[in-house]
Amino acid sequence: VADKPVDHLRPRNARFIGPLSRMDPARAIMPDKNYRIVCVISGPEPQRSILERELMRLLPAIPGEHLIVRGMPGPVPDERRGHVRSIGHLADDALTGALLGADLIVGRTGYSTVMDLERIGRTALLVPTPGQPEQEYLGRLHKDNGRFIVQVQGELDIAAALESRVAGTRIPTTRDSGERQLDVAMKELAGLLPGRCSGT
C-alpha cells in the first residue's frame, strides 16, 4: 500500500541499523560565517534547474547571507548575487558544518537527504522532486508526522518556513552511525556461520 509503512514486511530476524550517512557532526568544518539559509539542490534535470531558479528568485528578498549548493559535478565557478552565494558542491565535512550553522535548510526528500538530516539532528524544508514517486511519498509521510516542513516545488514560501516552529528545532540523533551499527551486525552474523574458523 503506497501510503502505509512497511513494518509488517520486515522479517523477524531483521534489524534496523540506523541512517547510513556520509555526515559526521564530530568532523564538521564550520564556515567562517554561518549562513541563514542553506539550500542543497539535487535531482535530475530539468527539475534541478527549475528549483534553483525558484530559490534564486525568492532568496534575495530574505534578509541574511544564504548559500545554494547546486549539486553539479565537475568544476563550477562560484557565483554571488547580492547576499546569495551559489557553489557547485562542498566537501562532506564542510557541508555538514554549513548545515549545522543554518537557521533553515532546504533540500529534496530523497532517502539520502533524510538520512543525512537524521544523522546531524536537523530538520529542514523539504521539496519533493516532481514525478519521483518515492520522494512524493516521503514528502507526504514527513508532512503528516511533522518532522519536516514539506512544500511543493513552484509554490515555495521560504519566509513561512523560517517562521515555522519546526524550522529551528533539533531532532534526536542516533547514538551510532549506520556504518558502525552495520559493522556490529556483520560481526554477529559472521559468528553464526557454521564451520567458521578463528582468524579468518
Where are these predicted regions, by residue range?
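A short, active-site helix/loop in glycosyltransferases that binds the activated sugar's phosphate group
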Residues: 1-12
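A short helix->loop->beta-strand "cap" motif at the edges of active sites that frequently abuts
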Residues: 12, 64, 122
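Donor-nucleotide binding loops and adjacent catalytic segments primarily
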Residues: 18-104
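Nucleotide-sugar donor-binding patch of glycosyltransferase catalytic domains
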Residues: 86-89, 123-168
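Short acidic active-site motifs
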Residues: 93-94, 113, 157, 181
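A donor-sugar binding/catalytic signature common to diverse glycosyltransferases
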Residues: 95-137
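C-terminal amphipathic helix plus adjacent low-complexity
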Residues: 159-200
